[in-house]
């Protein structure tokens, strides 16, 4: 076989590294090339002189390697023989090991069989032991049962309740162990004997117990009798407990029966005192110690007393309901709560049973007496308040206060309501349920106060005159509108202050009640008070506004056609300024601590005056260009003055609110635009209409007709202008013009409805406007006919 060359050998990297380490000598360095080694040995020509010595050294090294190889070959010549011998020894050892394992396996099998036999024997012994133990136990129980039944018969005859109490529970428990053997004659016989003994014992025990308590012979023997009663099956214990409690409460049932005079609510504390004495005697006499502790005889006696008392009180209150009043009811409830607190302290809550509200709850059915009484009290309070206000006793005086203050009765009312709510929470065992009923009473009271004590005393402007006759008298005779006196103004401001305070307090009351009872709502009453503040403001506005009626009415009486030049402002502006300078500061002082209402007052006043001024302009007929210019100047003067009304004659000259400025500007800017339209030429209808739409884009045909009348345009020429206007704005040209509208439709939107807050002054202005519109060019006879028709319509309207 050809030996593999060195290049064919494939050795691992580790082997190659070891060989490399072994081959490194002084002249053998595998990691260097042959040329590098020669250059290292002979770096120069002069080093060639050492060639012989180096050759000798290399030959010496070769000889050492040969010797080493010869030694290795010699020492490893017999390696294969030793390996074969070692392999044979290993095989022999494996054979011996297999024999040993087989022997161990055989011995293990025999051991398992021995263990199974031993386990089977142990189980048989255990079964035998259990059977023997059960037999011995059964025999022992049977012995106990036999001797127990025999002894029990003797004890019953001797009335040895101590022994019976000790052994009877054990005998009964043992008998239960023989339930599976009741078919056995002996067990059935023993069970029958025991039943007869229990029946005899039950009758005898009940008789002896009652006799012992009736004769008062109390001893430890009674405790044994009670233990026997507890051990006996059936209702022996419960029947005796019921009899004992009835005996203890028999006197109470007679003394405080519902037909006895002492049973009425005014003496309810006597019945509670009686039971406290009875319970004290019960414990002092040691009765609580005679009965077993688990009977809780004191607690059960108290519970029965509460039940009996609750039934008696319900019957007597039902029978004498007409005699109930809430103070008597409150007296009884107060003593009942005190008694229940005493019971709760003596007998704390146990097993979910408590004496809290044990009797108290019976009164809840009759608390409508409290509700009715509070309704009566509050109604009387409201009547008293109204009487005081009417007599002047309640009215605040201008001398005592510089500004309006709430009526003292408003604070008294809320204090009374608070007292009612507090009382209700003390009376009912379910206070939330009663408070819900009380809230209804509170709401009625608030509404009653708002109506009878506030609204009823708001001055009614023009109350001396009413109906259509009054309206026509104002038109024909121009009767002066009645004004409020300073005291009446102060009263109105006080009513406003009272309503505002009541509204804010009602909100606070609702928040407090909602914390306790979610869903409480008295917002309607709050809104009623806020509505009164608005009505009060309206009365003040109408009063101050009426001072300017004469000045506004004078506008339509001026012959504006004859005005040929523009001068200073017209007299009516000065008149209005003088009246407002006199009236507004007084109202401001009266409402000094309620600035928001004064601001609202100014807004209403300025807005209504501005609209009235526009209405007065519409009633002017045939205004010349100079007349329109004069009115334009007057309008600017009026606007400037109205913007200064909130701070008129005030030390502090503050800027008016934005809403106020916007409202005044909007109303009087329209007046300026109307006057500018009046100044426009009507030579060309289309140009006039375009100018009208430009200046008054939000106008309508009815308003345009009034503007034409202001310009003095003849009525027969109105149709052409109005039709052009309708075509321009896209309306139908076939609609009838304003002059053909029925009188009924015209007054429907102008007259105030009955019961509204509109004043007679507003009605006057509306009537004058329509009278001027409809009667301007009519004959006297026709005017009278139309006025009669108009009067009939007004009567129906009012």
Swiss-Prot record:
The keyword Membrane applies. It comes from the Eukaryota. Pfam families: VPS53_C, Vps53_N. Disruption phenotype: Mutants are viable but display reduced brood size and enlarged lysosomes. Egg-laying defect, slow, but coordinated locomotion, and reduced levels of unprocessed and processed cargo in the motor neuron axon of the dorsal nerve cord. The keyword Secreted does not apply. Keywords: Cytoplasm, Endosome, Golgi apparatus, Membrane. One of its GO terms (cellular component) is perinuclear region of cytoplasm. Ubiquitously expressed, with particularly strong expression in neuronal cells. Specifically expressed in head and tail neurons and in the pharynx and ventral cord motor neurons. It is a peripheral membrane protein. GO terms for biological process: negative regulation of dense core granule transport; positive regulation of dense core granule transport; positive regulation of locomotion involved in locomotory behavior; regulation of brood size; retrograde transport, endosome to Golgi. InterPro entries: Vps53, Vps53_C, Vps53_C_sf, Vps53_N. Its main location: Golgi. It is found in: Golgi apparatus, trans-Golgi network membrane; Endosome membrane; Perikaryon; Cytoplasm, Perinuclear region. Component of the Golgi-associated retrograde protein (GARP) complex, also called VFT (VPS fifty-three) complex, composed of vps-51, vps-52, vps-53 and vps-54. Within the complex interacts with vps-51, vps-52 and vps-54. Belongs to the VPS53 family. Acts as a component of the GARP complex that is involved in retrograde transport from early and late endosomes to the trans-Golgi network (TGN). The GARP complex facilitates tethering as well as SNARE complex assembly at the Golgi. Plays a role in the trafficking of cargo to dense-core vesicles, probably through association with the EARP-interacting protein eipr-1. Important for neuronal function. This is Vacuolar protein sorting-associated protein 53 homolog. The gene is vps-53.
